[in-house]
């Protein structure tokens, strides 16, 4: 039964992987364009923030973005293969030493800054 489920997930990933997904990790600043449905109209909303965690789990892969707007911390969990995700763009590559940046949740202002990575050639897709 698990092999059947695994094959189904792989088929769905192939169908949904027509959009280009860049290589990124925690600490990178991302710009995600998502489709938003307002009643009968549809528009694209852009969310830009720091990736605080990435979860690679096949079809259920996701990542969490965090940004500070008007002194409020906003977190958005985005599923990688969601049909509402229009595009993902890496704005900045961050230099961090952790895979999950949960310590960032309590930081604001200058203490929440992340250094920029200089060797981005090996991480570019």
UniProtKB/Swiss-Prot annotation:
This is Large ribosomal subunit protein bL19. This protein is located at the 30S-50S ribosomal subunit interface and may play a role in the structure and function of the aminoacyl-tRNA binding site. Signal peptide: none annotated. It holds the Pfam family Ribosomal_L19. SUPFAM superfamilies: Translation proteins SH3-like domain. GO terms for molecular function: structural constituent of ribosome. Keywords: Ribonucleoprotein, Ribosomal protein. GO terms for cellular component: cytosolic large ribosomal subunit. InterPro entries: Ribosomal_bL19, Ribosomal_bL19_sf, Translation_prot_SH3-like_sf. The keyword Nucleus does not apply. GO terms for biological process: translation. Belongs to the bacterial ribosomal protein bL19 family.
